[in-house]
């Protein structure tokens, strides 16, 4: 007891029972139907794990299954007596027989305790064997009831706590679904049960905890993060996933009997597939996935014709120690990709209903506008982020992405009484869609002294300004600590030598990364926001570079160095995400002439090195990735600093848009201080 070797010794000793019972296996074991001639007889007799045993018997000649079972149990008792240290626990021994598919009492008499013979007939009781609940008729009825009750119990238990909605979702994802995955693995109920009974429970509570609108498409909860979702485990998908894991484990088992049983079950499902039955067949699904994995290994990762930003599938690289596990992981990855594609197809196939508020909405599908975000980086909804936010943050992000916020236009689509005419509340006469409220209202753009749309733009710009200023300050510190360019030595004869350092230092010392800001120490910065986040009057282009006016002469932020004759500018746009691509090219065209003139020396005869950057941060927090990555890389904002800046600008966009949405009925906009989401200690 307590020794780590004790379990090994026990298993080694207990395994002798299988040898003792194997003598009568051919006379007592249960043989499967439809045996194929010329192949070994497929039968099962004893199953066991640790000190738990199960004995399955069938008819052989004149001896019935019940007689053979009692014979096997009595031989087991002989082995127990031989060990002199083991004995059966009669009260934990149960039995059940099937006669023409109906449960009957086999009336086995092997052990007696207090006038009762054991194994006892199971009747209406449930016996747990190796984690699975067994009933007399060997059906899955009881397991369905147990799973359903447990599912509801977990949901109500979590819902009854005083935690935030995000925290409840985290517990559901990492505790409840993890616990349920084991039940999905060992029980045999069909996917239709999960879809009809369990999935509605999960979706209902997740919608409640996340604040997702009742009519919103719940796929945002289960879609992968690259498709603007949260990536939560979906009960229907998790059930199929566990069934595939179990089936693959059986198909690749080291036990030839287990593999033989799997093969016969697979043949049965193949026959039903040829008959055209509609149920989900795990064996057929597994073989398709394995074929996909095998094809992927042969084809490799095709790159011909791939555009910028294309990323091919990761191909299988099996581990040398366990090729079956590597294949299973790759198979499940392909399965996840297929499920994700099916979700997208379902979303794009969903028709619009009663969309009379805005003609544009008739052209597309209601819930899939985010699919038009070309090369966009969606809001980071990782647990590390959302657990630090209030529930209102997640609620706004999910509903704004799905366009399921209660705007006047959407309420009219939903036939809500409070929708009125579905027009813009500010009185411009246009349909009150979310895009119009956050980006397009003429009345909002004409507000003075501050308009709500520019307030969001300037709040995002403030985060970029602080990051740039921090980067310049950092470059000055790096310049102080820079490695000397050469070392001087004096020989024993008094002669001096100067040895230049190689460009690539082979020492262990890490040399600082020299970016554009490290090439000079006289950088000046001019942004349309103040140091304290206050609004700044529109400033003209720096006069020591050029004196210009008119269209395309005033970027949002300018950085320049007179020593290196380098000028960098940043032009920020905060549009509706579907318009980010067109806005990007419009900004490029707007400032192209200024960049051309500066490079050509048309201002004061000085040729400048011009590094223009045009970035788009969507009204709902998505980022036009190409321009954003280019800006951060060229300015030397990498690694943790880039993640910090990305989170800061996304937070600024979401916070401001959320407040703009809350003020959608306020015709008079009160000037607001810029929201500062940049934190030095972040």
Which positions does each model-derived feature cover?
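Short, conserved micro-motifs composed of acidic
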Residues: 74, 86-125
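Catalytic cores of nucleic-acid endonucleases
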Residues: 529-532, 538-556, 560-561, 565-567, ...
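Basic, alpha-helical interaction scaffolds
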Residues: 115-189, 244-262
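Short Cys/His-based metal-binding microdomains
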Residues: 234, 414-471
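Catalytic palm active-site di-aspartate
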Residues: 1-7, 27-63, 80, 84-98, ...
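Extended C-terminal regions of large enzymes
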Residues: 197-198, 211-420, 652-656
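Conserved pre-motif C helix in the palm subdomain of viral-like polymerases
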Residues: 1-30, 68, 167, 176, ...
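Active-site metal-binding core of divalent-cation-utilizing nuclease and nuclease-like domains
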Residues: 37, 414-416, 476-569, 585
